[in-house]
Amino acid sequence: DRIVLPVDVAANVEGNRIDLKIEELPIHAPLFDLGLQSIRALSTRIKEAGTVILNGPAGVFELPDFALGTIEMLSACAETKGYALMGGGHTATLVSQRGMSDKMGHVSTGGGACLDYIAGRILPGIHALELSAQRYQLEITPVLHEE
């Protein structure tokens, strides 16, 4: 029902992680992760949520000092009481590497396509298959997976 925004961020200041409140922005340093307060608050909300959609990493996870937000968001999704949908190639890889795949409702390597599908937009690949089925008078039967 709500969109929760970060209250702080982590900037990369000469290679060091510096947490800043949103009110302290802008600064002349790149923002590389969520701040610690945001990580705690978002983790709590994710664990209590009915549905979680996580599309892409929370920060520059390739750098150890800036991977915390991404790792903690994934951990919270794995512990959520609700349904967790993960989208994006980086996210899918991290979920798999951390052995969390079986704790997620669905993991999609297509980040943008996943969001397009959720939004009800036409997916070009699916549309092409539907047109082909019509052209060759084939019936498409959806396959429903039981939990």
What are these regions (language model features)?
Residues D1-E147:
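Active-site loop-to-helix "anion-binding N-cap" substructures in soluble metabolic enzymes
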